[in-house]
């Protein structure tokens, strides 16, 4: 298994930098189900942030990228089940993906609730506002 950093996935997805994109493509396309790439939870969060913030990717495009990652047999995605849950929340409302993931991770850990000051996160994800 080979760990994949956010920048490798960004280059593969965007194909915007010829040399790095080609190297990322060769690496990712060489992966197999027996020797997969590993995508950490942090990498997923960074990938979403980079695509939305730096590339102005539409929410629908980000969702498609995440669904593709999660369906790819040649990738092992850390906590894929929790990411799927967060993705469903992300699709269904206006919350940031990170907020959806934070709430779902806390839920999976057995937390009674997730505390926040963010009103949008309260409305969209079911977090509890404090203060």
Label every model-predicted segment.
Residues 1, 103-131:
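Acidic, PIN/NYN-like endoribonuclease modules and their adjacent C-terminal/linker elements
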Residues 1-39, 54-60, 67, 131:
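Short, well-structured N-terminal submotif of metal-dependent ribonuclease cores
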Residues 4, 38-39, 77, 97, ...:
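Short beta-strand scaffold positions
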Residues 8, 43, 82, 101-102, ...:
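Alpha-helix capping/helix-boundary segments
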Residues 11-13, 50, 124-125:
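Residues that scaffold the ATP/ADP-binding catalytic core of kinase and kinase-like folds
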Residues 16, 41, 64-92:
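Acidic catalytic patch
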Residues 34-37, 74, 110-113:
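Short active-site oxyanion
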């Amino acid at each position: 298994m080979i760990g994949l950093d956010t920048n490798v996935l960004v280059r593969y997805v965007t194909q915007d930098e010829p040399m790095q994109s080609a190297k990322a493509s060769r690496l990712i396309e060489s992966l197999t189900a027996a020797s997969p790439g590993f995508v950490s939870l942090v990498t997923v969060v960074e990938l979403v942030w980079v695509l939305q913030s730096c590339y102005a990717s539409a929410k629908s495009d980000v969702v498609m990228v995440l669904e593709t990652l999660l369906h790819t047999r040649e990738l092992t995605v850390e906590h894929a089940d929790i990411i799927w849950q967060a993705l469903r929340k992300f699709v269904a409302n206006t919350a940031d993906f990170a907020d959806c993931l934070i709430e779902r991770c806390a839920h999976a850990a057995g937390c009674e609730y997730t505390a926040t000051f963010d009103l949008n996160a309260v409305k969209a994800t079911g977090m509890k506002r404090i203060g």
